[in-house]
Curated annotation (Swiss-Prot):
InterPro entries from the UniProt entry: ABC_trnspt_W-bd_WtpA (IPR022498), ModA/WtpA (IPR050682)
UniProt record similarity statement: Belongs to the bacterial solute-binding protein 1 family. WtpA subfamily.
GO biological process: molybdate ion transport
Coiled coil: none
Name of the protein in question: Uncharacterized solute-binding protein Maeo_1470
Organism of this sequence: Methanococcus aeolicus (strain ATCC BAA-1280 / DSM 17508 / OCM 812 / Nankai-3)
Domain of life: Archaea
Region forming the signal peptide: 1-25
GO molecular function: molybdate ion binding; tungstate binding
Amino acid sequence: MNKYIKQGAPILGILLAVMFGGREGDATTKTNTTEKTTNPITLKVSYAGSLSVPFEQYEKIYKKYHNNMGVQREAGGSVDCIEKIIYLNDTADVLASADYSLISTMMMPEYADWYLMNARNEIVIAYTDKSNYKDEINSDNWYNILNKPNVKFGFTSPNKDPCGYRSLMTIQLAELHYNIPTIFNDLALKNTNFGVEKENGTNTIIIPKEIKDINTDKIFLRNTESEVLEPLKTGVYDYLFIYKSVADQHNLKYIELPKEINLGYHEYADNYKKVKLTTGDGKTKTAKPIIYGITVPKTAKHQKEGIEFVKTILEHPEVFENAGQPVIEPAVGFGNIPDELKEFVEIRK
């Protein structure tokens, strides 16, 4: 018996209902079918590896208030995350970069029309109890320790990850700060196929498209932060240039570097910009304070939900703070900022 016909209905009514079906019955059937076959939305969030800890927490907060949503998080090098959107048709709904300028230079205007600057970081040198000279290294002698024959240090690829090119910028800035013109040559040039050009007070590091001829007895080089962290912990090598927040999150020991070279402070921006770096794709980056950027790409499948995720981040700055990444409050925004976010943002041109 048709479930939409009340018990006790006349036989003729039953037959007609079975043969032809009523309009109301059809409508109800369609509605129920839709409810059964509609899949919940899964939001795809792509972000720099150094954001893994806070973004795990942001996912929990977001899902608490959007219980019909799934979240797929994907960490990687910022350049790789963006290139997947541009070249591989990746449909990330949220993109967060460890270098805000990558959004403006690589994504705008075709793949994004706005972004926010929302948190900062700085470069430190992390180590473990297994590291050689762990009891001797400090903020004044680190470049001498790294140059010792039985010391191996690591950083991520400058062609793939902002932390990689920032690590090299830090080493180059050290030459200027300590007034020792051989630091970059001793640590980088002698052990890689990198180059450097010095002109009019500006030092430009040159990274070839193909990084090769790495002295693997001296340097541990991988594409992403996750690939360099575990080997450090297990004693594969001794020291790692990494973000302070990541070192804190992984309970690593580290030495802090002078503010003049660690890329962590706005007041030293004029000093930082004395160093530039040209990556393998020919793009030149100027050293500047480490500031994260976030956007919802134009290619996102779920624009509205992506904006809601960004709003969740802005509503809960304590998550970034607890992860060792000081927030910029209010966030600084550029471009066509969504209306839902404007109350949290200082918009600039």
